[in-house]
């Protein structure tokens, strides 16, 4: 079963992206994505949607 999660910028804290992941995975998602507020690519970490 997949759950919806938000990806939050590690620098400014904006929730810029929403995606899904498997519920049975223990580790959280951490992706390098573009942040429009910071105007650069930053690490985005998983948070509750």
From Swiss-Prot:
One Pfam family it belongs to: Ribosomal_L33
A biological process from GO: translation
A GO cellular-component term linked to this record: cytoplasm
UniProt GO MF annotations: structural constituent of ribosome
The keyword Ribosomal protein is annotated on this UniProt entry: yes
Entry keywords, A to Z: Ribonucleoprotein, Ribosomal protein
Origin: domain of life: Bacteria
NCBIfam families listed in its UniProt record: PRK00504.1, PRK00595.1, rpmG_bact
Family: Belongs to the bacterial ribosomal protein bL33 family.
Protein known as: Large ribosomal subunit protein bL33
Taxonomy of the source species: Bacteria, Thermotogati, Thermotogota, Thermotogae, Thermotogales
Gene name of the encoded protein: rpmG
């Amino acid at each position: 079963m997949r759950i919806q999660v938000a990806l939050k910028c590690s620098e400014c804290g904006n929730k810029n992206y929403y995606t899904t992941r498997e519920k049975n995975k223990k580790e959280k998602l951490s992706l390098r994505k573009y942040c429009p507020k910071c105007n650069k690519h930053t690490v985005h970490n998983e948070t509750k949607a």
